[in-house]
């Protein structure tokens, strides 16, 4: 009753109408409509992403201190402190698998458990799956190693290595209770409306200076945990430069980067409370991907079926006749239309 009376008073304030009788069905419907309008999201992008169902993420801290629990905790540590365990500066040179001092959790936020923060929660049961980039079916091990050579700019972990086994165990643990093939709402980076124009790195620089520079530095180099070395990783990760992800990483693609930024940045933002507008997110992501970063060899071999190549892949070859510039910054609707026409001719 308290909630109802509070809502009614709020609705009366918004509508400016004095209701004398709430028992009649017609007025009840009108009241509910007024409440819905008054509390509707004001941000278009937030409205575009459906609120996912409640997640029940298993608690790593509740695991027993046995071999099973230790392996999963080790996997979580490899996700959150990658640089300290398999980074390029660890004392044991045989363990230097990552080529930069990032952590997996710089992209897979909150140790892979944040909705629309590129979570790894619920992913295990989606594998094996077909990979357009490989042109073949891949396992969860293949997917982890794809991140190792692209986002971590390093080399593959051996399939039977303790590190790979621990990471896979952690991903499996996070998927506890998720059915095989179930796609959990909240995966990925979200989906906001696309621009009808190309995303603009020049406009994006202004957004970066205002909203990103304080954490990620003027030159995108981030904030290190220790000076002058990077052996303890970063408080705030580098967004470009030699210690960042390479140009074959998913975050080097505009659609992924823009949605990730919109639903997660600046710090404190989420899919319910984005802090940047849709245009700001697209433009600042364009600025980010326009900056120099490590080059991955062999990118021309990605996506053997070029008609399955994502429209925002920033490197050729292409099968649609559009330039690398448009693939990198958009607009993407004309590219999608051309690909659809080409597929119909197959």
Regions found by a protein language model. Give the residues of each.
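Post-cleavage N-terminal segment of exported redox proteins
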Residues: 2-3, 19-20, 29-86, 129-201, ...
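Bacterial N-terminal signal peptides that target proteins for export
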Residues: 6-30
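Sequence/structural segment immediately N-terminal to covalent heme-attachment motifs in c-type
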Residues: 67-111, 196-236, 257
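Extracytoplasmic electron-transfer domains, predominantly the class I c-type cytochrome c fold
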Residues: 69-73, 78-86, 106-157, 167, ...
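Surface-exposed patches in mature extracellular/periplasmic domains of secreted proteins
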Residues: 85-94, 155-160, 180-184, 272-275, ...
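Short, solvent-exposed loop/turn and secondary-structure capping segments
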Residues: 90, 115-121, 179-183, 219, ...
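Short linear capping/connector segments at secondary-structure termini
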Residues: 91-95, 122-126, 184-192, 241-242
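Conserved non-transmembrane functional hotspots
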Residues: 300-339
């Amino acid at each position: 009753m308290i909630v109802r009376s509070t809502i009614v008073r709020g609705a009366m304030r918004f509508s400016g109408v004095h209701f004398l009788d709430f028992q009649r069905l017609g007025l009840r419907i009108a009241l509910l409509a007024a409440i819905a309008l008054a509390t509707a999201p004001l941000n278009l992008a937030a409205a575009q992403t459906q609120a996912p169902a409640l997640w029940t993420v298993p608690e790593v801290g509740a695991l027993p201190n046995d071999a099973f629990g230790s392996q999963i905790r080790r996997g979580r540590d490899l996700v959150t402190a990658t640089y300290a365990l398999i980074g390029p500066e660890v004392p044991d040179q045989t363990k230097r698998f990552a080529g930069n001092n990032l952590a997996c959790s710089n992209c897979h936020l909150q140790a892979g458990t944040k909705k629309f923060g590129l979570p790894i929660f619920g992913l295990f049961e989606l594998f094996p799956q077909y990979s357009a980039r490989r042109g073949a079916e891949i396992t969860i091990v293949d997917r982890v190693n794809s991140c190792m050579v692209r986002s971590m700019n390093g080399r593959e972990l051996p399939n039977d290595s303790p590190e790979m086994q621990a990471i896979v165990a952690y991903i499996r643990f996070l998927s506890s209770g998720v059915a095989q093939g179930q796609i959990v709402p909240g995966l990925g980076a979200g989906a906001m409306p696309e621009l009808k124009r190309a995303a603009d790195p020049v406009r994006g620089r202004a957004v970066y200076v205002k909203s990103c520079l304080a954490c990620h530095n003027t030159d995108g180099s981030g904030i290190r945990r220790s000076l002058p070395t990077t052996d303890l990783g970063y408080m705030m990760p580098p967004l470009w430069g030699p210690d960042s992800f390479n140009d074959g990483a998913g975050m080097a693609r505009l659609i992924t980067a823009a949605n990730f930024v919109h639903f997660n940045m600046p710090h404190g933002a989420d899919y319910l409370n984005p802090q940047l507008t849709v245009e700001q997110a697209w433009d600042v992501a364009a600025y980010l991907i326009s900056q120099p970063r490590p080059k991955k060899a062999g990118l021309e071999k990605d996506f053997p079926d070029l008609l399955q190549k994502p429209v925002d892949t920033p490197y050729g070859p292409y099968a649609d006749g559009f330039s690398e510039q448009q693939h990198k910054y958009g607009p993407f609707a004309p590219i999608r239309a051309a690909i659809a026409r080409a597929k119909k001719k197959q």
